[in-house]
Amino acid sequence: MKLFRLTVAAVALVFAGAISVAQAETLRLLTWGSYAPEGLVKKFEERYPDITVEVTFSNNEEMIAKLRATGGAGYDLAQPSHDRIHAAHLEYNIYKPMDLSMINTDVMESKLLDGVKANTTIDGEVYAVPHQWGTSGLMADKSKAPDFKHWSDLCDPMYKGKTSMRLKRTILLGVAFSMGEDPFAAYADLDKYQEILDRAVEYLIACKDNIKAYWKGGDDLAAMMLSGEIVASETWDSTAYRLFGQNPNIVFVPPSTGALAWIDTFALPRKGEADDAAYKWINFVLEPENVTAMSASSGAIASVQGAMDLLPPDKAAAVNAAFTAQDIANLQFFANIPPGIEDMEGKALERIKAATGSE
């Protein structure tokens, strides 16, 4: 009888272990490089010991390519920008609707939440919610370029050989706005948009002698700014915020036509297998102390109410040095990218690269 009891107990333990293994879950996260800091991942796994987080770092183009290749399989939570969801899903069927009742949306900034919902609603279903937001614009060393505030200043002969830019779609859009155009409105008229691109290409080719170098990564840009090789550049705001901590003369400058604003989101891949874990992660990073840790990692601002107050002190100082209330009101949010636009922009950029000798 004693042996029987021990055997039963042993079987029960094995069975319980099997159940535990069966209940274990993996959250496969497809995200940007700074959106899954090790400290937060560890903290999440400690709170939910039945969930293991696997992180794949990516960008907008790669996210679409990876999910397109698998039909939305291989990942449980993705973080595309708000303007890269609608067209990608309509074309490739890679996402599934979100259950907003599972998300603490009441802590989100209503303007950002409503904007993302509007951009990602398809057939009455919402496909994303906001995570963090930031901008692209200009950066200047105010001790050397105190009046720098227009996209066109990058090409001002006053700063010949002392400016930089990255040959990506942001500079095309910035130049378009500086020419008095609204490129986002022109998305609805591809002929009009091509005219705008042609003018931007001519302008940027003519600008090449003003450019010290075309930056490709944030580290390249930071080195040029800190060394004084350049006095201003087109940039992500997060790069400028980082440099502000090393030299308070280097500040992010919202262009006079408005900084270009993006919102990175949370979206569920169509064949994801861990929706509950995904919702837990979303709610976890919305908690105030985790918002601060995330912003410290990313340099971006959370899409929650009171986000400015939750920034680490150094980031808060950099943001306050960059933005006024009017600058915030003047933000130009990236619009949904319809099919065909990226191909047009890619060809425009190739023309500039060929003419300027940039790779």
Predicted features by range, described:
Residues 137-144, 176-178, 263-274, 293-294:
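A bilobed periplasmic-binding-protein/Venus flytrap-type ligand-binding module shared by bacterial periplasmic
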Residues 260, 269-329:
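Mature extracytoplasmic/periplasmic domains
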Residues 197-207, 245-270:
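Periplasmic-binding protein-like
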Residues 25-88:
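Early extracytoplasmic/lumenal segment of secretory-pathway proteins
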Residues 74, 82-85, 89-222:
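Extracytoplasmic ligand-binding site segments that recognize negatively charged/polar headgroups
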Residues 83-87, 232-249:
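A ligand-binding cleft/hinge motif common to bilobed small-molecule-binding domains
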Residues 325-359:
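Conserved C-terminal helix/tail region of periplasmic/extracytoplasmic solute-binding proteins
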